[in-house]
């Protein structure tokens, strides 16, 4: 008998495969095209006719169509759409705080989820500059003359975003020696003024931190115990260094110790804190700073894990906004050099001046690392407090009482 002994099985297997594929295809076609019956369709739902026809090339209007202007418009429109989504998330978070719903920890999960979403969007916005950078400076120069006096500074949504997060008006860099709002007229100016008068995310987070459970002097009294432990720890550190026999090593360590001591003791000087607050070098109230530091130290406790995630997200947003500004500066420098901006500003030089801690909102959270101390210097929680932090449902200081302290 000639031929492959497995030929029959092979053909059978092939036919079976074809049959199975036919069945899969049949199942794939069992749906119903509901759109054919009328009603809302994809393009109408997203209003794509408006969006996809919102790219008017000024170079084309002037009779000299430049290809890369289309990319320039699309990229900036995408930025504005994402700014709108960030404002949507930010307003919802501010509303939760304003209505006091943040005391219910179930709502804290909403806050965390929405702030994380803002973080992810900002990461996308930072990366989006790479698309614009596929255009050369010469390509941009071909249509730049058609843009004036339009300028990125005129982005209403970005200014609203800065205000609602909590950028201090006193720390803003003047735009051509004028208040930033002077560059917006009519309704836009009113919207910006209104956003300045509303409670910022910074103020709402500050009030929330001031209620951190465990700060009460007649309760756990974290701050009082922490100060006591710091003084004791510094004294022990001083004696340890004093006992050293190597004079050179001893001198170096003593100099470092004095610096550390000055930094840590300043932490308990409320008047100095208020002075730095008045100068804009600190943003949070003294009690809010205590709450943030307590969350920082006890972040592994179940009660403080979610609050710590929020503080982390706030720092992430600050970091990403700084990166966004920096990438913007680099792109402008690359495209314009040191020429003036299309809106009349000094361009690169003005933008570079905004990449600083003046525009950081939660700078105090970054500075918490300054006060890191050995773990055994951090006050220990007694079993009652530890159990309470695990079982409490609401972040309200009234849940602590004096008989729960050491």
UniProtKB/Swiss-Prot annotation:
GO molecular function (one): identical protein binding
UniProt-listed HAMAP family: T23O
GO BP, sorted A to Z: L-tryptophan catabolic process to acetyl-CoA; L-tryptophan catabolic process to kynurenine; protein homotetramerization; response to nitroglycerin
Cofactor: heme
Binding positions (substrate): 72-76, 144, 342
Chain positions found as Phosphoserine: 19
Lineage: Eukaryota, Metazoa, Chordata, Craniata, Vertebrata
Family: Belongs to the tryptophan 2,3-dioxygenase family.
Protein task: Heme-dependent dioxygenase that catalyzes the oxidative cleavage of the L-tryptophan (L-Trp) pyrrole ring and converts L-tryptophan to N-formyl-L-kynurenine. Catalyzes the oxidative cleavage of the indole moiety.
Assembly description: Homotetramer. Dimer of dimers.
Known pathway: Amino-acid degradation; L-tryptophan degradation via kynurenine pathway; L-kynurenine from L-tryptophan: step 1/2
One family name in Pfam for this protein: Trp_dioxygenase
Protein name, entry field: Tryptophan 2,3-dioxygenase
């Amino acid at each position: 008998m000639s031929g492959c002994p497995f030929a029959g099985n092979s053909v059978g297997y092939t036919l079976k495969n074809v049959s199975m594929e036919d069945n899969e295809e049949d199942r794939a076609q069992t749906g119903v095209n509901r759109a054919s019956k009328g009603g809302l369709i994809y393009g109408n739902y997203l209003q794509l006719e408006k969006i996809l026809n919102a790219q008017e090339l000024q170079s084309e209007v002037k009779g000299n169509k430049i290809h890369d202007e289309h990319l320039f418009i699309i990229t900036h429109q995408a930025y504005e759409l994402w700014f709108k989504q960030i404002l949507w998330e930010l307003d919802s978070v501010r509303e939760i705080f304003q209505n006091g719903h943040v005391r219910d920890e179930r709502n804290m999960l909403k806050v965390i989820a929405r702030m994380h979403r803002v973080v992810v969007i900002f990461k996308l916005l930072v990366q989006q500059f790479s698309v614009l950078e596929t255009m050369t400076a010469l390509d941009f120069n071909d249509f730049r003359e058609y843009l004036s006096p339009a300028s990125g500074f005129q982005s209403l949504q970005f200014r609203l975003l800065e205000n609602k997060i909590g950028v201090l008006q006193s720390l803003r860099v003047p735009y051509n020696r004028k208040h930033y709002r002077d560059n917006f007229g009519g309704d836009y100016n009113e919207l910006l003024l209104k956003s300045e008068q509303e409670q910022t995310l910074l103020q709402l987070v500050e009030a929330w931190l001031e209620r951190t459970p465990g700060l009460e002097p007649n309760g756990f009294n974290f701050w009082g115990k922490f100060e006591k432990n710091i003084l004791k720890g510094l004294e022990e550190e001083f004696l340890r260094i004093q006992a050293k026999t190597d004079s050179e090593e001893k001198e170096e360590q003593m100099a470092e110790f004095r610096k550390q001591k000055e930094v840590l003791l300043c932490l308990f000087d409320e008047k100095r804190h208020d002075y730095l607050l008045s100068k804009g070098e600190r943003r949070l109230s003294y009690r809010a700073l205590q709450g943030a530091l307590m969350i920082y130290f006890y972040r592994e406790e179940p009660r403080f894990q979610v609050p710590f995630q929020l503080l982390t997200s706030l720092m992430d947003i600050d970091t990403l906004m700084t990166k966004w500004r920096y990438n913007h500066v680099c792109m402008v420098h690359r495209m314009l050099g040191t020429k003036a901006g299309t809106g009349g500003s000094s361009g690169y030089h003005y933008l570079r001046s905004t990449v600083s801690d003046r525009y950081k909102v939660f700078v105090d959270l970054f500075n918490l690392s300054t006060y890191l101390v050995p773990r055994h210097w951090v006050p220990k929680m007694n079993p009652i407090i530890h159990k309470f932090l695990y079982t409490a449902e609401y972040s309200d200081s009234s849940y602590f009482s004096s008989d729960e302290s050491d």
